């Protein structure tokens, strides 16, 4: 059985090598996504913790970014084609919530927002059928810097006050379990060809960020997340 699997894997590698050695051309895409993030959460309180304090409910927020997709393209201007490219870029990720906080003897629902400057590194294979360009991929986002906006309770004044904390990379590593998050995404573009090497794409994207886990002694699990959806404009240059 192991021999069969080894031979099958070897045949797959040879076939893949032959595929990329024939009719594939280098190319690059420049993509500008604009959209919304719909925040998610996964929380489990510790046994002795107050089950109401710190509970999150998701809100939506605006997000944006910029990415480049250098890769290899086959049949870019044909009726059917395929490409495999890196997904490299910058993204402003926002996780926005309503948070239940204890102030004195009462709870108050406050707005809490985590914003991050991220560098994404991933892989984005795409199929083109006629003028439609469809991609499914994923990778990781490195949290370079960020901030937290919320309201905290002042015991002396017996009231909540606005609070904003900035995070550099070291502070992110202290606040969260990992400074990177996995992501998956799908893209759908309609291409307008200027010639057989250059095209403008207008389309949609959707994805999910498996957000960072907050270090908090009240929780055994306190994970952020977001469903992302929006529109994008792209330019593709392929050496056909």
Language-model features and meaning:
Residues 30-36, 64-74, 88-90, 121-129, ...:
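Residues on the lipid-exposed face of transmembrane beta-strands in outer-membrane beta-barrel proteins
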Residues 20-81, 234-240:
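Short glycine/proline- and aromatic-enriched beta-strand/turn motifs that initiate or cap beta-hairpins
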Residues 6-8, 28:
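Short helix-onset patch at the extreme N-terminus, typifying the N->h transition
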Residues 22-30, 78-84, 119, 130-134, ...:
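Outer-envelope beta-barrel architecture signal
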Residues 36-63, 89-120, 142-181, 185, ...:
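Extracellular/periplasm-exposed beta-strand and loop segments of Gram-negative cell-envelope proteins
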Residues 194-201, 211-215:
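Substrate-binding/catalytic groove segments of enzymes
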Residues 1-4:
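Positively charged n-region of N-terminal signal peptides that target proteins for export
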Residues 8-16:
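Bacterial N-terminal signal peptides
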